[in-house]
Amino acid sequence: MTRRFCILLAITVLSKCTGFSFRTSNSCTHRRMPALHHHRSSSTTNQDEAIKELMKTHDPILLFVSRLLDADIARDASALYAWCRRLDEITDDPSSDVATIQQRLSDWERRFDMICRNEPVDDMDRALAMYVQRNDDLELSPFVDMISGMKEDTVQNRTISNMAELDEYAYQVAGTVGLMLLPLLKANVEKSRDAAIALGKAIQLINILRDASPDVALGRVYLPQDMLKAEGVSTEDVLQLKSSPEYRKVVATVADHAEALLIEAEMGKSTLPGVGPLFVQIIVELYREYLIKLEQIGYDNLNLSGERVKINTIQKLMASFKATTKVLTQK
């Protein structure tokens, strides 16, 4: 999740540097807290330091990127980062069993309710509470949707029933991050919301196809069960890394769906001023390279080494060049 957050924060940095301005709708599922006082205080300093330490430990590059933002925007983006990072730590804790992780995530839902009631537990919660208060147009449902997706992901031998369920999961764990960041961009939701969600979902679907082998090692199969069954492929076949022509056909179908989402995101980039369209196009082309790589290897994304599908530095540079050329020729 934090990797997706880094991508979206980079877009935020770009957008604020180029004067990109957006607005979001007022669609919330939780009761908002009483007004907070925003003057600089020792409490605010404690919040900043707590989150900086978290970034320094886990994502030092992101800490550097956050310094490119003005103070208020950096503080809000960092508060969102801390929320996502600490959720990751709950689900990635190797010492916890499924029941414990599920309980901790339920506790985290209640904790978010407390944030909305201005009852933060610690300094990092307080930072998020201030972000919520400063942005009346912030949608609160994505915070809960993300936790729901993470709960489902903790189930042993995780499977997905159909494409609709896969789309919902991709929204929960990736599209939600974009919605959380929209207030930082001041986005016009009618013009940008669907494209932003499409980009997040595409990134997640491509990550699933890219990371199939390491996911199998964790007992997780994210390809739709109905599609596998229609091709005569069982979950056990996938867990045993049997990459049959029928299995690869399902991979190709999901890859086509991811490409359609990339196209939707690509079409939505025209609403962005400045160099915003360029950076969206770069992300689209980078992730499209994974789809090209999958096609080149015959959609065989299972291997005994447990490694994910990779693209090299030259491919990444070429994707960036391709994106730049596309944007410049479209002007």
Name every feature range the model reports, one short phrase each.
Residues 1-5, 36-39, 275:
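Absolute N-terminal positional cue centered near the fourth residue
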Residues 18-31, 308, 315, 324:
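Intrinsically disordered, low-complexity serine/threonine-rich segments
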